[in-house]
UniProtKB/Swiss-Prot annotation:
Keywords: Lyase. This is Putative pterin-4-alpha-carbinolamine dehydratase. The lineage of its organism: Eukaryota, Metazoa, Ecdysozoa, Nematoda, Chromadorea. It catalyses: (4aS,6R)-4a-hydroxy-L-erythro-5,6,7,8-tetrahydrobiopterin = (6R)-L-erythro-6,7-dihydrobiopterin + H2O. It comes from the Eukaryota. It comes from Caenorhabditis elegans. InterPro entries: PCD_sf, Pterin_deHydtase. It holds the Pfam family Pterin_4a. One of its GO terms (molecular function) is 4-alpha-hydroxytetrahydrobiopterin dehydratase activity. Belongs to the pterin-4-alpha-carbinolamine dehydratase family. Its EC number is 4.2.1.96. PANTHER family: PTERIN-4-ALPHA-CARBINOLAMINE DEHYDRATASE.
């Protein structure tokens, strides 16, 4: 093991011991400990069930989203007046994606933006893909 990694682990153990044993009541330290560790061990996002796919993807398909051949993903191409409008759109989507911690695969040339959504953590379409696609549709309609 690298010495810097070993040093990091030792400091983490010391910090957790310090927080949980000596300075907080047990219920607070447990919550603090769980919250801290939760950053490292996020819950895996579930795939959409068959009924969720039927229900939630139908509206997106009507809006022009397509299933990607050979992948569990959805894709749509957007066209704008010019690069400035396309870039503004990408900025809005990027800010929302960052808040969701869910980032699209996308490609931009001048006034065209091609977006593919899939959740890498679960290997396919998840509720986050539907949520982000729905947000994208809401800002395109404005």
């Amino acid at each position: 093991m690298h010495s810097s990694y070993s040093h990091f682990l030792q400091r983490l153990r010391t910090s957790v011991s310090y927080l949980s044993v000596s300075h907080f009541p047990s219920t607070s330290s447990h919550r603090l400990f769980s919250t801290t560790i939760g950053v490292f061990a996020r819950k895996k996002m579930p795939l959409l069930t068959e009924s969720e796919r039927t229900e939630q993807l139908s509206g997106l398909k009507t809006a022009g989203w397509k299933l990607v051949e050979g992948r569990d993903a959805i894709q749509k191409e957007f066209h704008f007046k010019d690069f400035n409008e396309a870039f503004g759109f990408m900025t809005r989507v990027g800010l929302k994606a960052e808040k969701m911690d869910h980032h699209p695969e996308w490609f931009n040339v001048y006034n065209k933006v091609d977006i593919t959504l899939s959740t890498h953590d679960c290997g396919g379409l998840s509720p986050n893909d539907v949520k982000l696609a729905t947000f994208i549709e809401s800002i395109v309609k404005k």
